[in-house]
Amino acid sequence: MFRILSFLCSWILIAFAQPDMSWFFSLLGSAVGYGLLWYSLEPQKSPKLSWRQLTSLLFLWSVTVYGVHFSWMLSDLYVGKFIYVVWGVLISLLALLFTAFSCLLFFIVRKKHTKILWCLPGLWVAVEMVRFYFLCSGMSLDYLGWPITANAYGRQFGGFFGWAGESFILVATGISFYQVLLRKCFSRYVWLGCLLFPYILGGVHYEYLKNTFSKEENLRVAVIQPASSMLLEGPWSGSPAMAWQRLVSLSSIVRKPVDLLIFPEVSVPFGRDRKVYPYDDSQVILSPLTHFKHQDELLANVDWMQALSNHFNCPILMGLERWEELDSKLHLYNSAECISQHGELIGYDKRILVPGGEYIPGGKIGWSVCKKYFPEYALSCQRIPGARSGVIEVENLPKMGVSICYEETFGMLLRNYKREGAKLLVNLTNDGWYPSSRLPQVHFYHGILRNQELGMPCVRSCHTGITVAADALGRVIKMLPYETRYRKASPGVLQVSLPMQNYPTLYAFWGDFPMIFLSLLSIGCIGCYFGYRLLAKKEKA
């Protein structure tokens, strides 16, 4: 009976161990959830389950847990029914990885290979690194150690070892609690050490930084949240200039003076330079606020940006599409463009693209298969990853490290911004592809980790997601209402004086390299251990 209860309790604890769902389940699940699961299936008591039974139960447990974690993908209004196939393949693949890892753990426990038991956390980190950096564009969401970040101390631990350190310590905590349930010697002390280590280390660092935090240097930022996306809402009647109507109306709310005005990802259609807006129609919309400097017959989005920049006497940062001709071919980029009062235009092209939404995985073969069997999902024009640096430097502003969409969830990418001298992280996002889902919260709780990993403040500009400004300790300064299952996002302006204090972190210095080394060392130890035993067995024979 205890085994059945342990199995069910472990499912409940881990399924809801998501920082966006419950900080309580996140902290309790990371402490005892995996240990309860492993003990329920292999308590080293009779009756023992067969390997087939173990594998089946592990896969069932894992696939249903991951199904809950990625439930936001099932919002199919814009992405279509094919997303159910993608969701099923993704959670099955992740479940297979966890099932294989757990079976290896049970094999080691059954055969009493205790010398390599503590190599398993490093092995799991290696497994996650493969899917983190090499599965399509990288699957950075819902890594195993994410529940640790449900409080500020756990997030601050990421400033030492990043996401990989969090996953390592969570697996070590799970294994040690499993050993506690098996009544192994000293296991209780090991479990308490693994459990408390990230919170003590992160907590001491966090409290020290909080007590020495300075608010002397501030940046006056205004962020526009349209609460809609022209990209998703489709064509409208009337002049193309109507695309700017809501943005101009919201901009009129902004109070001067302001140092930087930010708009979200792909705020308006037609790209950066395409001249499609009739001057007369555009001037009618813009006239309550300001006017255009040049009276060209047709205007482009950069002309609107320049007019706003001149009016507010500050740079404008906006998400736009950008077309570029290379080798007689047109290439499409998802870009962030920044224009100054003096007309200086600096941009960044998104480097980590969303598979399926911005490109078809598998190259020409993948695109051909998609076009033949799923023609409605074959993208008419695929974006390509950019090469321009995401660090944007504009006169009278600190250097900004710009990311687009889920790029902000990759610590190694944004770590380069810190090394290039960026003082502020800016993310432009459109979470509207999955309306009335958990995605805005999931995305935010992954992205905000970069503040404490790198010791930098951040600003997020979203259409319907979480538009927020937070300091370098991850403390929210101001947040706008965002879309959930129960409410729609509200159009608005986030205007805030953001503390610009930065601080150095070990993760910014060494990134994932210590955990990569530890993972390779763990794999090497496991390989040498089994290799030595195999050779010894052959010699005896």
Swiss-Prot record:
Pathway: Protein modification; lipoprotein biosynthesis (N-acyl transfer)
InterPro entries xref list: Apolipo_AcylTrfase, C-N_Hydrolase, C-N_Hydrolase_sf, LNT_N
Enzyme Commission no: 2.3.1.269
Top EC category: transferase
Active site: E265 (proton acceptor), K350, C405 (nucleophile)
Membrane topology label: Multi-pass membrane protein
Main location, first listed in the record: membrane
Locations listed in the record: Cell inner membrane
Task performed by this protein: Catalyzes the phospholipid dependent N-acylation of the N-terminal cysteine of apolipoprotein, the last step in lipoprotein maturation.
Protein family membership: Belongs to the CN hydrolase family. Apolipoprotein N-acyltransferase subfamily.
Listed PANTHER family: APOLIPOPROTEIN N-ACYLTRANSFERASE
Name of the protein this chain belongs to: Apolipoprotein N-acyltransferase
